[in-house]
């Protein structure tokens, strides 16, 4: 039976995504190993926190290669920081902007691939990207 893999790298709200997919009737598995990601019909990359910490957690989990491969080959959804990680990775490795980043994380880079919404630029106590 096919399922959706929810990537468990220590920086995402896994149970919220898992419970939502269960409620909607989608088979899903928490993926803490590459084989669960590789055998999935689709992949969700949730994320919370700061980009450098999340990327370090993903690398430490040993799932980076499986996640990158899945993003190229399967339906793939990044949620919150997970989506930002995907866009920044695209900016760095496809567009060739080695300093690609989100303006929230590095407002000095010449290549902000994720910007703040105009009406939220003065809000400092919450995320307001895109």
Predicted regions and their residues:
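N-terminal beta1-alpha1 cap of cysteine-dependent amidohydrolase-like domains
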Residues: 1-130
């Amino acid at each position: 039976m096919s399922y959706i893999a929810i990537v468990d790298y220590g920086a995402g709200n896994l149970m919220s995504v898992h419970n939502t997919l269960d409620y909607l009737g989608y088979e899903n598995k928490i993926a803490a190993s590459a084989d669960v990601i590789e055998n999935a019909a689709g992949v969700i990359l949730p994320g919370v926190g700061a980009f450098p910490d999340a990327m370090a957690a993903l690398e430490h989990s040993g799932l980076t290669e499986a996640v990158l491969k899945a993003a190229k080959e399967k339906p793939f959804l990044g949620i919150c920081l997970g989506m930002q990680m995907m866009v920044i990775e695209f900016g760095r490795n496809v567009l060739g902007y080695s300093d690609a980043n989100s303006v929230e994380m590095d407002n000095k880079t010449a290549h902000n691939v994720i910007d703040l919404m105009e009406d939220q630029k003065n809000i400092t106590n919450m995320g307001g990207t895109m």
